[in-house]
Amino acid sequence: MYNEGVTSPSQLARKKNATDKWHGSSIRKILENPHYTGTLQQCREYRPSVTSKRRRSVNLENQIIIEKSHEPIIPLEDFLIVQEILITRKRRRPQAEVHLFTNTAVCKDCRRSMHFKKNRKGYVCGSYNKHGLKACSDHYVSEIDLTDKVITNLNKIYLKFSKENYFKELSEKALKYKEKIESKIIEINEKLNDKKRDKSNLVISLANGVISKEDYQLAINITNEDISNFETTLHQLSKDLEFQKIEKEIIDFKKSLDKFMKEGTLTPEMLHLLVDEIEVHANGTIEINYRFREPTVPSA
């Protein structure tokens, strides 16, 4: 129904978080609703309290049921056949099998988690798996390839960590960038304060009749834009400054990496200690974001 462009129930109800996608639970509720057979069935659910948002089901004997209360859309016989089919298809969900990259691998394009497909021995985009090509492409990557790439990358990082003076170089690089960012923050703060003074002077000039309203409006718009740009730059610089505080991050990552090299096995627990996220592109290539970050050049 999503692929055919049929309006979803949430869109029809104009909900704030409405989506164009149909979900299995919505379809099931429609199939199980006797209202379409001409039967009025009321008091099917209730709320335990006025403050509760959760609904609970009411036993059938306590519901109000009025048959042939309105014109049916579907015959009762068809409805009963559907109920029998639903019962035969109903099955207990097996305990969810945890795969190595569950909750770690994500689709680069739609940001949904990758789902493991046993028949393909790999992962596909969650949006594609649930809603098809209209939602996203499959972004398929095999579990073996993904494991090999992660292990290869971890081995490269381990060799880098093993180099003499590597930690010292990282600390010096972080300190260098930190000082550069702090200097830039002081510079931008001075410019921001100058612009705020200019804004105050414009207000005084307008009040004293030194400038016209038109000139004031033109000047104040430019000044406000400059102030906004400086504030945005300061916010980004503050984030960059926080990014340089990596010493503890490096130590924790190194401990986990040493443990992995000693054990030689990539388990889900070990993966989550080392890897923050794996982004899978449409062509199957990957980007690995580790829980360790090298100091980076300031963005501003």
From Swiss-Prot:
- For bias type Polar residues, the affected ranges are 1-11
Reading the lineage from the top rank, the first entry is: Bacteria
* Taxonomic path: Bacteria, Bacillati, Bacillota, Bacilli, Bacillales
- Keyword terms, alphabetized: Coiled coil, DNA-binding
Under the heading Pfam families, the entry gives: Recombinase, Zn_ribbon_recom
- Signal peptide positions are none
Write down the Gene3D superfamilies for this protein, in alphabetical order: Putative Large Serine Recombinase, Chain B, Domain 2
Region entry Disordered: which residue ranges?
Answer: 1-20
Task: Name it.
Answer: Uncharacterized protein YefB
Organism source for this protein?
A: Bacillus subtilis (strain 168)
